[in-house]
Structure formats: C-alpha cells, structure tokens
C-alpha cells in the first residue's frame, strides 16, 4: 500500500510539473524519485532538496496529529520547530553516503500500517 501511495503522490506531482513547467517525468514514478528529478531539473542543490523534503514530510505527519489527535496548532508548531535540528543533522550525515548506504526498516511502522490497512474506517491510506 505504501508503494501505491508513493506512486499516486508521484503521479500528482508529476502532473503539476508537466502542466506548469512542461517538465515530463515517466508515469508511475515514485514521489521521492519525482522530487529528486525535479530538483535536478531546476538546479536545486542536494542539501536544500534533502532539507525541504524531510521538512515537508515531518510537517505533513505533524499536521495529521494536529487534526486527529488533536494536539492543537501551538503544539504542532512546536513539534515542527523541534524537527529542524534533526533534519539538519540527517542532511549533514547524508553528505558522506552513497547508494550502498540506502535502506532501512521500520518494524513498528510496518506492523501498524498493516493493522491500519484492515480497519473499516480509515482517514488515510497508510
């Protein structure tokens, strides 16, 4: 389901790039790949691309918490601010990585995603 979601978001992003800037990315390209291709096309430095992508990802997760826990706008903004140093740290660490370093596993996230997929009422796909 996460792969499907990433492709659907990628297709939406790809459509905006094509419609607004006439920049074409192949259909069914995953969102992170679309972001990387767009950053290269628009000459956005890698470090800014990483920071922007991670900040956007964290903000989206926190926005879900604001709406559904609810934690409120103030606490949500505080959470976003608290991510800045970690995002910078991740960006700095990534400067020395290569393709062989890519990978990851999130057992708890995967288990809860599987449980979430089987709920009758769902707010989001994953």
Regions flagged by a language model, labelled:
Residues 56-126:
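C-terminal auxiliary extensions adjacent to catalytic cores
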Residues 1-68, 78-81:
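Amphipathic alpha-helical interface segments
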């Amino acid at each position: 389901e996460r792969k499907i979601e990433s492709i659907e978001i990628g297709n939406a992003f790809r459509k905006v790039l094509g419609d607004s800037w006439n920049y074409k990315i192949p259909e069914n390209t995953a969102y992170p790949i679309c972001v990387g291709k767009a950053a290269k096309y628009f000459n956005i430095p890698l470090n800014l691309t990483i920071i922007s992508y991670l900040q956007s990802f964290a903000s989206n997760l926190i926005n879900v918490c604001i709406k559904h826990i609810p934690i409120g706008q103030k606490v949500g903004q505080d959470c976003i601010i608290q991510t800045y140093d970690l995002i910078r740290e991740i960006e700095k660490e990534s400067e020395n990585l290569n393709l062989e370093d890519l990978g990851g596993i999130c057992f708890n996230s995967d288990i809860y995603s599987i449980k979430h997929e089987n709920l009758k009422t769902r707010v989001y796909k994953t």
